[in-house]
């Protein structure tokens, strides 16, 4: 019993903090008054009790990548991960595992924020470099209302030992992001240290709440090791908790949110003999392999993730590679003391509930780690409640509304009072 008590003392420092890194201080102002007609081709409106409810569609990019304790160098090309050559999404959520090696000094010591700073710097440069060359030379075209930059901004970045999640939005969306918060759960050594577990982040965009869970579950390819992974999932869903807010109307638990996505190195393996697994991988028999995929089997048997969804997997297993190569671990020769690890889809992205539609589910090919990154693109519906015209006229002159009408022809904007 005493090791757990010792660990809990450590956790008060290492996991107990709700602090996170962001480009702006959290926006908790509930007095958001709409100033635009939201004349966007993506929106549709419904009249309701003298207010107007608008449904907007946003694109959300989600990725997960176990980087194997590798610190990225300044020249790492993020194009493969972020696909910045494509039309940018509105929101980017990037999850990482093993951003630091999982040795005792990192697990028991304070978090090395230099590593997360390095990753965030690479992400910022990649996202904003893509946007700038395509902007109009007129400064007014590159900024939203009140001069808010269109550059992508980090609204939440949180690291727990080797787990890092970082969330980025277009700069003009920031005024409508409220109540960002984090929740860390350790499931590792002694059942509570942060070498395994999750970092969950939540925020509200307009009237819709989001929760993203970045996790690293128990490893192991032996029979019944999946039971420990199932236990980790249940612990994460049970123990993750967020503040309810001053009005006690904010979601507290993960599944209470409107849009929920679970991503990470879930570590589920393929329940087939190693040699058979390798042969099926070589012949790209994905369907046969997926029939024996532990995550899918556990979901189908009702052991975990009831009501969750995953997109169609059409890519090769993402683990375990020889770093800086296209060869799976063990394909050449074994050392006597090496463990045999068959290929598996360890890295996954799944979601819960309605309001999310997945359009892409792929893997990247960056080779610095023994894992390949996995990424997905969703569209999501966002609810916006517009106040009555009398309220608007109390705050805004006709001249101001006329100017907002001009802005509406290009984009939609809100302001806070």
UniProtKB/Swiss-Prot annotation:
Output the GO biological process annotations, alphabetical, semicolon-separated.
cellular response to salt stress; phosphatidylinositol dephosphorylation; regulation of clathrin-dependent endocytosis; regulation of reactive oxygen species metabolic process
Give the Enzyme Commission number. 3.1.3.36, 3.1.3.86
- Which reaction is recorded as catalysed by this protein? a 1,2-diacyl-sn-glycero-3-phospho-(1D-myo-inositol-4,5-bisphosphate) + H2O = a 1,2-diacyl-sn-glycero-3-phospho-(1D-myo-inositol 4-phosphate) + phosphate; a 1,2-diacyl-sn-glycero-3-phospho-(1D-myo-inositol-3,4,5-trisphosphate) + H2O = a 1,2-diacyl-sn-glycero-3-phospho-(1D-myo-inositol-3,4-bisphosphate) + phosphate
Family (UniProt): Belongs to the inositol polyphosphate 5-phosphatase family.
The lineage's top-level taxon is Eukaryota
- Catalytic 1 as annotated region, ranges: 258-273
Q: Where is the signal peptide?
A: none
Query: Could you identify this protein by its name?
Result: Type IV inositol polyphosphate 5-phosphatase 9
In this record, what's one Pfam family?
Exo_endo_phos2
InterPro entries according to UniProt = Endo/exonu/phosph_ase_sf, IP5P_plant, IPPc
Gene designation per UniProt: IP5P9
User: What are the GO MF terms of this UniProt record?
Assistant: inositol-polyphosphate 5-phosphatase activity; phosphatidylinositol phosphate 5-phosphatase activity; phosphatidylinositol-3,4,5-trisphosphate 5-phosphatase activity; phosphatidylinositol-4,5-bisphosphate 5-phosphatase activity
**Keyword annotations from UniProtKB, A to Z:** Hydrolase
Species this protein is from: Arabidopsis thaliana
Keyword Transmembrane helix tagged: no
Segments carrying the region annotation (Catalytic 2) are 339-354
Q: In which tissues is it expressed?
A: Specifically expressed in roots.
Keyword Hydrolase in the entry? The reply is yes
Q: What does this protein do?
A: Has phosphatase activity toward PtdIns(4,5)P2 and at a lower extent toward PtdIns(3,4,5)P3 but not toward Ins(1,4,5)P3. Functions in salt stress response by regulating reactive oxygen species (ROS) production, endocytosis, Ca(2+) influx and stress-responsive genes expression.
Gene disruption phenotype: Increased salt sensitivity with reduced production of reactive oxygen species (ROS), reduced Ca(2+) influx, as well as decreased fluid-phase endocytosis.
